[in-house]
Amino acid sequence: DKQFFYCFVCQESGNAIHFLRQYENLDFVDAIETLASSLGLTVPYENGKQDKIKPSGLVEQAVRFYQKNLNNQIAEKAIQYLKDRGITGETAKKFNIGFAEDKWDALSNHLGKDIPINELEASGLFSHKDNKFYDRFRGRIIFPIRNIKGEFIAMGGRIIDEGEPKYLNSPETAFFNKSNELFGLFEVKEAEKKIASLIVV
């Protein structure tokens, strides 16, 4: 009723915003937005502008598309590659691993033709040449990258046949800065909520 919490173990206390910041490791603005979203509300910003750019919904659509591909016969070689490296189906599912066919337009055809050009460019999923968009990831195992909130913001792709580059990452976008992200951090946080610090080697 008093709208605050108290932990008898660590003596931490505060309001709902403070609790969410500590529990989910969010900054103040992200905590406010998360709470508002859970209530079906939007946070008003001065002049209608947000300080942070939201991840493109196209990235999550691409992740689901590539993830579905991994369950098809077209991904037989990719599945064998993962098995040879000890990556189980359970692990692949946990990390949303997928497969991009070796085609120039598989993803673009899946998404459809009605997506505005600026959204295609902003997503980091396509290459642009001669006024045409081509799938950036082709013939690769896809490893999606999430931010600390669990939103899909980018991906890395490992080629399974001969070709270069062996590894290809999403370019930096308005919502993805490679220097600020760590692959797998969200999954680690979800697996163990009480982790206060990590040592990366």
Give the residues covered by each predicted segment:
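Non-catalytic accessory segments of DNA primases and related replication-initiation nucleases
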Residues: D1-S123, F152
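Phosphate-handling DNA/RNA-contact segment within nucleic-acid enzymes
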Residues: D51-K54, V59-Q61, Q80, E101-V201
